[in-house]
Amino acid sequence: AGVESLTAFARGLDGAPGAARVVRLGEPVQVEPDLLAQLRDAGVLPDAEVTVRSDAGQVTVAREGTGVVLDLPDEIARHVFVAPLG
């Protein structure tokens, strides 16, 4: 499978959790220092393996071991690109 936005990947999960590798962060995410800091704290950075879940208008994403779970609105999640694992 190829690279897709976090929003598209999460939508395909039908509410179940899914595993993906973060490939890149789009420019709209890169220019927001506060958002970048949140992503860094959660370990949601390129090459990180994350667990993703879709939830009404937002995407929940977490990296094991960080203890941080991010709820990203779709308008932000669509600028985080992932490749499905497994």
Describe the function of each predicted region.
Residues 1-75:
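Mid-protein regulatory/catalytic core that forms ligand/cofactor-binding pockets
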Residues 76-86:
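Short, charged, intrinsically disordered terminal tails
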